[in-house]
Regions:
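Conserved binding/recognition cores within well-folded domains
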Residues: 7-115, 121
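Receiver (REC) domain switch/output surface
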Residues: 1-7
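C-terminal output/interaction extensions
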Residues: 127-137
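A general lysine-centric signal
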Residues: 92, 126-127
Length: 137
């Protein structure tokens, strides 16, 4: 005689509801990045970064608060981390947050004016791509 175990029908709805709630909370929480510097590690919201500028083997961060931070990593390393968050490398020395672009000027070799008033040069090979990105905003 074989015993047959009967499993109760388990309602997946509560677990699914909890999973969906966790996903929603994760999507709503601000994304952050850790910036290593000479005095320790700084955790900042990605949305607070307006642009980054290469300085040899260091990267200068420009924040929306007006503060700057010098990180002990190259711009290339941060480029890889920030591309999914609407950042574009428009020059070998500049990575910008597209959310803070105010204007693109074609004269004088081409440059971008950021919301903080800074003027960022655009490399010749990046101009066409930048213009298409701006048109799609």
């Amino acid at each position: 005689v074989r015993k047959v175990e009967v499993k109760k029908d388990i309602d997946p709805a509560p677990k699914l509801k909890t999973l969906m709630e966790n996903i929603r909370q994760a999507a709503d929480s601000p994304k952050k990045i850790v910036i290593p510097s000479s005095d320790g590690l700084h955790v900042i919201k990605i949305s607070d970064i307006s642009r980054c500028e290469s300085s040899s083997n260091y990267t200068q961060f420009f924040l929306t608060t007006g503060k700057t931070m010098l990180a002990s990593k190259t711009l290339k390393e941060f480029d890889g981390m920030l591309t999914d968050y609407n950042f574009e490398r428009i020059h070998k020395s500049h990575l910008i947050n597209m959310n803070f672009v105010k204007r693109y000027v074609q004269s004088d070799g081409g440059y971008v004016i950021m919301e903080d008033g800074s003027r960022i040069p655009v490399a010749n090979r990046k101009k066409e791509h930048l213009v298409s990105l701006l048109r799609s905003l």
